């Protein structure tokens, strides 16, 4: 039974997250229906990251096991054809080696968050950025973000509904930079807690507008208390950008 590794991108706006849910539109559900239409097999899609409602992906990694062996290009093209007009695209397909697993073999996941920082609202990127009117100090945000790098208890930045066994995570990267009218945040870790990136982003935005200081972010992290978190950023600007193995 061949295992196919796929890299996909999607616009998360129409979906109630990646993970399949009965009677609700999800990315996983759309892909599984496309596969069934292609080859008649009922399969389960496994993903590197189970993104939330409205979250996008530029390079989500998934795998499926099929009874029949197909050329990788055929799998890609057929699934894409049956996905239309869903805003999901299979970019790459290859046959996985050994016991490789999209979720459990991953060693790093990267997320990017886009904040549109200007007075005027977005027209073309509505639903793809978080619009913040007040001027943000990206350098101050970046400096504050460095308190998040390393191995920490991230209870403060963990959603109360998070089902992870432990709040301990190692943040390998936390950067903030300005690109014209946008402030872009990037985070890298082996894995993340539920709504961790959005919680950190919303908190760092408080630094950007001058309500919080870098010391406040450090104190919030050390509090290990969800009530110490700043506002949670909306899903609109969040993208899964890379998975490493």
Region roles according to the model:
Residues 1-245:
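Structured-RNA-binding interfaces characteristic of tRNA pseudouridine synthases
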């Amino acid at each position: 039974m061949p295992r196919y590794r796929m890299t996909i991108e999607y616009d998360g706006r129409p979906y109630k997250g990646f993970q399949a849910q009965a009677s609700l539109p999800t990315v996983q559900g759309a892909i599984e229906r496309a596969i069934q239409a292609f080859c008649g097999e009922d399969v389960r899609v496994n993903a590197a990251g189970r993104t939330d409602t409205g979250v996008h992906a530029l390079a989500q990694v998934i795998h499926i096991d099929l009874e029949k062996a197909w050329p990788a290009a055929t799998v890609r093209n057929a699934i894409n054809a049956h996905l239309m007009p869903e805003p999901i695209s299979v970019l790459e397909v290859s046959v996985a080696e050994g016991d490789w697993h999209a979720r459990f073999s991953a060693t790093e996941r990267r997320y990017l968050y886009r904040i549109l920082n200007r007075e005027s609202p977005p027209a073309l990127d509505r639903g793809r950025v978080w619009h913040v009117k007040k001027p943000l100090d990206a350098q101050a945000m970046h400096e504050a973000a460095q308190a998040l790098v390393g191995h920490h208890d991230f209870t403060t930045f963990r959603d109360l509904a998070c089902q992870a066994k432990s709040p301990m995570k190692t943040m390998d990267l936390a950067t903030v930079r300005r690109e014209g009218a946008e402030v872009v945040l990037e985070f890298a870790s082996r894995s993340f807690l539920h709504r961790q990136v959005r919680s950190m982003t919303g908190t760092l935005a408080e630094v950007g507008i001058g309500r919080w200081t870098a010391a406040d972010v450090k104190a919030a992290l050390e509090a290990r208390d969800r009530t110490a978190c700043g506002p949670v950023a909306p899903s609109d600007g969040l993208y899964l950008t890379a998975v490493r193995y």
